[in-house]
């Protein structure tokens, strides 16, 4: 199994967040956004859409969260 980037998860598939890389901590406001959105290590979610600009929409506890390409390429997840 192993991990992959959030952007590699197929629409309709579920995942568990494994790691938020340090690189994202240096983006102003991004870490707070991820924490408020429950996109934190150990949390489960499901990819519901991927837009042409690379934004990945995920369902976290019933809430739709749009994750930009920069973050979705770097957040590591595992399939559930």
Mark where each language-model region is.
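Mid-protein regulatory/catalytic core that forms ligand/cofactor-binding pockets
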Residues: 1-71
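Glycine- and charge-enriched low-complexity intrinsically disordered segments
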Residues: 69-80
């Amino acid at each position: 199994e192993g991990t992959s980037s959030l952007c590699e998860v197929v629409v309709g598939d579920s995942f568990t967040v494994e790691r938020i890389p340090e690189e994202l901590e240096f983006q102003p406001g991004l870490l707070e956004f991820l924490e408020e959105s429950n996109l934190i290590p150990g949390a489960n979610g499901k990819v519901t859409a991927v837009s042409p600009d690379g934004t990945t929409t995920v369902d976290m506890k019933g809430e739709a969260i749009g994750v930009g390409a920069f973050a979705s390429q770097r957040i590591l997840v595992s399939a559930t």
